[in-house]
Amino acid sequence: MSQYSGKIVFFEGKCFTGRRLEVFGDCDNFQDRGFMNRVNSIRVESGAWVCFDHPDFKGQQYMLEKGEYPDFQRWNGHNDHMGSCKPIKMHGEQYRMELFEGQNFTGQCVELCDDCPFLQSTGFSKNCLNSIKVYGDGAWAMYEEPNYRGRMYIVERGNYCAFTEWQSENPNIQSIRRVVNYF
């Protein structure tokens, strides 16, 4: 399977009303496209997306899969601020990652190939995850709380030497799931 950008449409008003912005790939700043940072509803027509509440792919992350989100509470937003977005890339259907307790791939290591609602159930002794290697084809969503709750971070294929590389402010990760709804 090749990479696919997809399509996402942002609306200023709730229930898909008001001005709209259609995006087909990376968009680092909504204002550069003449769209204010106020988003009250979203329609994902294809693909899976990671959206950020600030420009330049910064701030709180929200994963949006194919479907309709008539108000910001539906994507677990705390307000209507949205500043940038990009499609989550998929290269195939193989998922594999290694999790490390220490920075720079040191300390206890656990391998995942499937969803994990509670990281400590794998034998990982702490909820401190300081570095990861994503080997597989797909992306992963990592959450600060068990059962896929709390602040979320998206990671794609690559090496992340420290938690700051996935834009976290701390190493607390307690659940991880595969991003599977790409189309």
Swiss-Prot record:
Molecular-function GO terms, alphabetical: structural constituent of eye lens
One GO-annotated biological process of the protein: visual perception
Membrane-traversing stretches: none
Domains as described in the record: Has a two-domain beta-structure, folded into four very similar Greek key motifs.
Annotated PANTHER family: BETA/GAMMA CRYSTALLIN, GAMMA-CRYSTALLIN N
Family: Belongs to the beta/gamma-crystallin family.
Protein name as annotated: Gamma-crystallin N-A
Native source species: Danio rerio
Name of the gene this protein is made from: crygna
